[in-house]
Regions:
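AMP-binding/adenylate-forming
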Residues: 90-102, 114-162
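Nucleotide 5′-phosphate-binding alpha/beta core
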Residues: 1-75, 80-98, 102-106, 110-112
Length: 162
């Protein structure tokens, strides 16, 4: 893997911010003895987060921004243990929409498409992420959510979703 000096500087800036905040990830970095990286090989020294680490941070231990900056909460289902709660800032929400927009663009979609959103909405990130990305793309969005097959098919035909 090749990495530029600018990328190393950006990673080190993030490492310092996490260490200074003394949050979940800052503590993981301290425990691993990581305060900076100098090369691509140093990525091997970065600590992993395992599922139990994330569960043990319940409910808001993964928060990396001040609480007043948190605008949304998403969560895993918690079917096999405690759910993993992910706090989002406004920038996180916007970044998520931009990433979804890029996915649509990579699939060849444009603002001329009509996108029917069928994943669920709520604590899970999928439905709202698909919708935010489609809106960022400028496409027409039909926010159906899951289920109701007859209605789904009718809307696909009537709205000519792509």
């Amino acid at each position: 893997m090749q990495i530029s000096s600018n990328q190393i500087a950006q990673v080190n800036q993030q490492i310092q911010a996490l260490l200074n905040a003394n949050n979940f990830y800052g503590k993981k970095l301290k425990e691993a003895g990581v305060s900076s990286i100098q090369s691509a090989e140093d990525f091997e020294n970065l600590p992993f987060s395992e599922k139990n680490d994330l569960r043990n941070a319940y409910p808001l231990g993964l928060m990396t921004a001040p609480e007043e900056k948190i605008v949304r909460i998403h969560s895993s289902s918690g079917t096999t243990g405690l759910p993993v709660i992910i706090p989002y800032t406004a920038k996180d929400v916007d970044d998520w929409a931009i990433m979804f927009k890029r996915c649509y663009e990579m699939a060849g979609m444009t603002n001329m498409d009509r996108i029917q959103i069928t994943p669920g909405y709520g604590l899970w990130t999928a439905g709202i992420g698909f919708q935010a990305g489609a809106e960022k793309l400028g496409a027409m969005v039909v926010p159906m959510g899951p289920g109701n097959t007859d209605k789904q098919l009718q809307m696909m035909m009537d709205m000519k979703t792509t």
